[in-house]
Amino acid sequence: MSFFLGLDTSNYTTSAAVYDASNNTVLQNKKLLPVKPGEKGLRQSDAVFQHTVQLPQILSQLPISDISGIGVSVKPRNSEGSYMPCFLCGEGTAGMLGHAMQVPVWKTSHQVGHILAALYSAEKLSWIREPFLAFHVSGGTTDCVLCEPDEALLLRITPVSCSLDLKAGQLVDRVGLMLGLEFPCGIELEKLAMQSTRTFRYKPTMKELDCCLSGLENQCQSAINNGEPPCDVAKRCLCAISDVLLEMTKRASAQIGDLPIVYAGGVMADLLIQEKLQNVKKSAFAKPAFSCDNAVGTAIYASLCNAGN
């Protein structure tokens, strides 16, 4: 059997996927966690409840009877103290299924799942054999990390740089809510920005390799207060994020060396942001379905761990 189940229960989405290692194809199913209009997200207790409701529904629509193993994200990052209760839902389900079906369970982080999903989507999974840089840009992280092959973890993750305050996904959602969009706001903010004909350039606020994004929130609020059209505010926000990521990329490459770079995470589903980074040498981007939270990466993680064993 060459089928591997992946699970991911983040603070945004309930996700499951089945990866067929024999032909490198994937079938995924996922569902956003419901958020009340006007709210900025879910408390962890509410996220755990929603995952408990949604995960059986998600799994019932996937062919999991012949799987050889399970991959699951159990924490946000592979770092000491990294913890979020919502990941217990996926971890518990994976443990029960693994025991019932007598198949192994391999545990990893949400971040590694994002990176592997992006590499798979970009047809760059071969990169895991050598060092490369990865950006994980989402509601919880704006990180650049060095990824190196590791016998035990598959990928050894070393932080290179990050946002010191607001994360890019938080900025997107906060600006979207200012403009009356529903949370999470990424897709609608991009649609709004596409209507703008203006060009925006932003000088990033940097502290060595790290960035600061909180000033952007204030700029967007001021623009709204001054009567700037919503489409221009949206584009202002997204162009600024892309300028920040480009500067982080330049500084990380200067520090670490000329390595391949993959851009992962929900914010990187935005085509306006991708467009500004397309000229980065040796870069790779995931398709939107593999940028947003998903379980494809954890399914592939299980397959790779199985092959290694």
Model-derived regions: residue spans:
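Conserved phosphate-binding catalytic cores of ATP/NTP-utilizing and phosphoryl-transfer enzymes
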Residues: 1-2, 103, 107-133, 300-304
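A short helix-loop
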Residues: 2, 9-10, 19, 27-28, ...
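N-terminal phosphate-binding loop and adjacent alpha-helix
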Residues: 33-63
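Phosphate/pyrophosphate-binding loops at sites that engage ATP/ADP/AMP, CoA/4′-phosphopantetheine
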Residues: 56-69, 249-259
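Short beta-strand-loop/turn "lid" adjacent to the catalytic site in phosphate-handling enzymes
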Residues: 60-95, 99
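Glycine-rich beta-strand-to-loop/alpha-helix junction loops that act as flexible
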Residues: 72-75, 138, 262-270
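Glycine-rich phosphate-binding/hydrolytic loop that grips phosphoryl groups
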Residues: 114-118, 286-309
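A contiguous, well-structured pocket-lining segment that forms one wall/lid of small-molecule binding clefts
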Residues: 187-261, 267-284, 303-309
